[in-house]
Amino acid sequence: KKSAKYCSLVGIVVSSIGAMIYYAASFVCSTEISILLSMVSTIYVTGAFHEDGFADVCDGLGGGWTKEKILLIMKDSRLGTYGVSGLVLILAIKFSALREIHPYLIPLTIISGHSVSRFIATTLIYTHPYVRDTADSKAKPAAKSISIGMLSINAFFGLLPLFFFKTPLILLVILPPYFAK
């Protein structure tokens, strides 16, 4: 229940592995191969946890018309056409976005992306009501137990990597969760 405060710190640890893989590979491989190896390493380290969740969301939103049907599809362990399509597209977008960044900034961008995204996810859990009403839910206890103190610790680790960029405009990434409610 108290692990939410370390969500962004976990993002820093996982992404540091990916950033180190990118950095080491960049000495012997092209930027493209280095990015792909970094992506593979973070997917492997997390057990494809986030990709599985994203595929479930794509399947649910693509195949369901009501809240109940969407949630039922998302709970189904099978991978559907919308999930596969979503995974291919999101990984292609991630690769393409990293490819557009100066190679020097890619490791910092990887670390920032992982920490900020986990901070945003935790913020949304804190600010929004839980969707599922059933008692057998896995995430509802975590969603109810996040305090402002836990969110503050998470914010510290989530936003820390942004301060290593040379422009204060990078801090604009924290605005979407603020306006999401």
Where are each of the predicted segments found?
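Hydrophobic alpha-helical transmembrane segments
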Residues: K1-G47, G63-E68, D76-S77, Y82-K181
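Juxtamembrane transmembrane-helix boundary signature
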Residues: F49-G53
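Carboxylate-dense, calcium-coordinating segments in secreted/extracellular and ER-lumen proteins
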Residues: D59
